[in-house]
Amino acid sequence: MSVTLVTASGMGVSAHRVDEYLQAARIAIDPDRVQLELDLTPGIALAETILADIDRDHDGSLSSEEQRAYGRLVLDALTVDIDGTPVRAELASAGFPGADEIRRGEGTVRLQLTAALPGLSSGVHHLRFRNRHHPDRSVYLANALVPASDRVSVTAQRRDANQTELTIDYTLRAAPVRPPAAWLLGGLVAATALSALAIRPLRSFR
């Protein structure tokens, strides 16, 4: 996924306070799907609270199952819709720091999500993303990434005051018409020649 932002928000990811849970979302739109990167960084004052959400058996380690469970918990708090129609996002991958890194306020949970889009006509479309995960003492950032496909052009981004909601206006261009393959053209030429021979009137011998 490209990491180039269409526009950058005013707050750097590393500038969050110790008593905040920074949630930074980056969204990439392709013609047939949307990909989301979500970085979750708790400050020192919130570290134990977030760790308790992840480390459900309280053994001090973050097991693969606990990581997946927390990823699903975050996913349940996110919504994505295209032109008002909800689309289902799925957790593609998750990266978790160690518990000690989180306690020091240096650990970032990185989630990658993907959602298939319905067949869309060319023209203007609107994708809306909402994040309702852990609203207490969280700070949200949301930005669109520069599309990888030249068929997609982001034209505007609209956020609510807290950046829990981002609407991306974009234009989708029609897929280019591909010329027929050379072998297909050759086959058509041969078929045309054979057809011409088949319909040629036979001459009688005198």
Walk through the language-model features, giving the residues of each.
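Compositionally biased amphipathic helical and low-complexity segments enriched in hydrophobic
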Residues: 6, 118-121, 203
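N-terminal soluble domains immediately following signal/targeting peptides that reside
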Residues: 12-189, 195-196
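Juxtamembrane interface at the cytosolic side of transmembrane helices
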Residues: 194-206
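Bacterial N-terminal signal peptides
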Residues: 1-8
